[in-house]
């Protein structure tokens, strides 16, 4: 990713909920990431999403923290906070608890906000909590890389 971001002269900020910092960890494990990586935050709770990212309480109440609307808002807000070219956001239910019939364990929303708008994808990952979080982090980075190309 470093070569893609460097070539494009672009910057990145990340807001992670269910992945708990895994995306930022993967990015910062590569020397030279400071050339493009501006911010990584983990607003895990609804209160943190409101306080850190200024996600509307009405949006959280209407759609829930695990929703397309919240993922999109997170990606847009984290991008704006540090004036990054790109913002990635992840929100989901890694389990084993916290699920409902409508929102099962493994449901994850990934959003990428960039210069040309926002894309959001819904995924259903299977496996342990660790596996769901790992798959979500990988999918989020893949989504960004596809958008960069």
Sequence positions of predicted segments:
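Short alpha-helical segments enriched in small residues
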Residues: 1-149
């Amino acid at each position: 990713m470093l070569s893609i971001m460097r070539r494009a002269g672009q910057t990145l900020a990340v807001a992670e909920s269910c992945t708990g910092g895994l995306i930022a960890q993967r990015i910062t494990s590569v020397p030279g990431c400071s050339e493009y990586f501006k911010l990584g935050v983990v607003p895990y709770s609804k209160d943190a999403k409101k306080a850190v990212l200024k996600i509307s309480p009405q949006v959280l109440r209407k759609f829930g923290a695990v929703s397309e609307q919240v993922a999109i808002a997170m990606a847009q807000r984290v991008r704006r906070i540090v004036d990054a070219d790109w913002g990635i956001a992840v929100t989901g239910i890694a389990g084993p608890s916290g699920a409902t019939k409508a929102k099962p364990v493994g449901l994850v929303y990934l959003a990428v906000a960039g210069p040309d708008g926002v894309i959001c994808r819904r995924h259903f990952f299977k496996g342990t909590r660790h596996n769901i979080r790992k798959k979500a982090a990988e999918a989020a980075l893949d989504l960004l890389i596809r958008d960069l190309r």
